[in-house]
């Protein structure tokens, strides 16, 4: 929602004394791709139910009953990437998931897509994401985790269409 509503850019501008109202997008009606449907992925799918989103999922396991009950389409990774408006990762970092979103896979994303990684660093080619964000080939990205923490790529962190947090996704009381 932060990315769809341009909240990060708006906050930066307000702090600098710039009062400009950005026109953002709504979550409702979007196609959301969930990569990894363990506990967190399933919780997210449940939370998205009221927003009338088209829900796509990719996982090594088939959660057939859960998908049916929550109106989720199980699809290939390639189909999920090419069809989704928002792609969110919920995977462990293993040999099979490391760099799962390599340059070739990232190129399947729509230009207006938003990429979210609150799972693990090392799942996404961060250099390619930065390049795509700079060229307007990806609308936005939000990461809570990075391949190297703290991240050393200050250029990525300072892009107006990037939102980063310091690995706090699981920090709650």
Question: For each predicted feature, which ranges?
Answer:
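Short, structured coil segments at secondary-structure junctions
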Residues: 51, 70, 158-160
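Glycine-rich Rossmann-fold phosphate-binding loop(s) that bind the pyrophosphate
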Residues: 37-38
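Phosphate-binding beta-alpha-beta segment of Rossmann-like dinucleotide-binding domains, i.e.
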Residues: 1-31, 43-50
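C-terminal helix-to-coil terminal segments
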Residues: 23, 149-173
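Gly/Ala-rich phosphate-binding loop of Rossmann-like dinucleotide-binding domains
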Residues: 45, 49, 133-134, 157
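Short beta-strand "acidic-cap" motif of Rossmann-like dinucleotide-binding folds
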Residues: 55-59
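Rossmann-like adenosine-cofactor binding region
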Residues: 61-155
């Amino acid at each position: 929602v932060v990315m769809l509503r341009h909240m990060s850019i708006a906050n930066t501008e307000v702090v600098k004394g710039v009062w400009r109202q950005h026109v953002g997008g709504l979550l409702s009606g979007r196609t959301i791709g969930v990569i990894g449907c363990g506990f967190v992925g399933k919780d997210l799918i449940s939370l998205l139910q009221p927003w009338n989103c088209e829900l796509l999922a990719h996982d090594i396991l088939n959660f057939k009953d859960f998908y049916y009950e929550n109106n989720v389409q199980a699809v290939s990774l390639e189909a999920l990437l090419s069809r989704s408006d928002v792609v969110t990762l919920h995977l462990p970092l293993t040999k099979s998931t490391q760099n799962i979103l390599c340059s070739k896979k990232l190129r399947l994303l729509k230009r207006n897509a938003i990429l979210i990684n609150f799972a693990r660093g090392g799942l996404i080619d961060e250099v390619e994401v930065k390049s795509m964000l700079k060229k307007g080939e990806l609308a936005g990205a939000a990461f809570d985790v990075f391949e190297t923490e703290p991240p050393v790529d200050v250029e990525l962190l300072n892009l107006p269409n990037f939102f980063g947090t310091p690995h706090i996704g699981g920090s709650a009381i």
